[in-house]
Amino acid sequence: MKFFLGMDMSCYTTSCAVADEEGNIIYDSRRPLVVPVGKKGLRQQEMVFLHIKQVREVFPEGYPFAAVAVSTSPRDIEGSYMPVFAACESFGQVAAQASGAEFYRLTHQHGHIAAALIGNEMPDRFLALHVSGGTTDVCAVEKENGIIKKITTLGETSDIAAGQFIDRVGTALGVPFPCGPHLEKLAEEGKAESLRATFYDMNVSFSGPESALLRKIEKGMTKEDAAATVQHCIAKVLIELIRRAQKETGIKAVLLSGGVMSNAWITAKIAEATGAKFAARKYSPDNACGLASLARNIYMENQ
């Protein structure tokens, strides 16, 4: 029996996963990087230090790996770089060398899209939205035999990502970081107000809605209404991006991934409006399951 390792070290999670020859995820371990109370996040050097400390807590032991796939950059575009992914590449190389395994350099975005493909049947050409704390991308994806061959970015945020919008508003409301789950709970009792986002073709700006909402909070808007307003704005923006991408490309199939897609209200609204598919909730946050799956598929294709 052969086994396939995926490793991802993102801004806030250390992750390892193992797939077997049949493509089943048989091991999935993640450890969040702890953000001290009152802080809005961590610096890159703090993230790298924490990954180094806790990678041993998530690393699977006792598996003879045939292939290892790791995220070596945030996205599949020139100039995409973060120090945390350099650390991930180094650990992955050591794991591959120790096992005599093949080594595949992929990206954090590959991992999210591949994780979303687990349990979702998609055509070989589809639209993918990667929506997280650091990314709000609209992409055209080409795959073959379960392998992502090409990711083309069609549009992105021109300033902050959807997840940053959530966290900045959450921090202003005094909820713990990361703020997504807390805002989703608050929004259940809130009434949303409309915010206007600015679009440039398939690019979007969230800074305007953020500023407008922070002003409303300063004037006394309740936490519940503010949380509901964030959700409403993000869902509306993503629906518009999907429609623009479908019109531009002629591609109808859509798959959404990333931590923001853990929000059940947002996903329900998008599904109702567009018929899009989503990563399973357990695969929406940062994880290494998609990378393990790709390691298996790439290895099998090469045999």
State where each predicted segment sits.
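Active-site nucleophile and cofactor-binding loops and adjacent substrate-binding regions
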Residues: 82-87, 103-111, 129-131, 159-160, ...
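A contiguous, well-structured pocket-lining segment that forms one wall/lid of small-molecule binding clefts
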Residues: 181-254, 260-277, 296-303
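Glycine-rich beta-strand-to-loop/alpha-helix junction loops that act as flexible
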Residues: 70-73, 132, 254-263
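Glycine-rich phosphate-binding/hydrolytic loop that grips phosphoryl groups
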Residues: 112-115, 279-303
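A short helix-loop
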Residues: 2, 9-10, 17, 26-28, ...
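Conserved active-site "lid/cap" helical segment
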Residues: 13-72, 216
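Short beta-strand-loop/turn "lid" adjacent to the catalytic site in phosphate-handling enzymes
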Residues: 57-93
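Conserved phosphate-binding catalytic cores of ATP/NTP-utilizing and phosphoryl-transfer enzymes
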Residues: 1-2, 101-127, 293-297
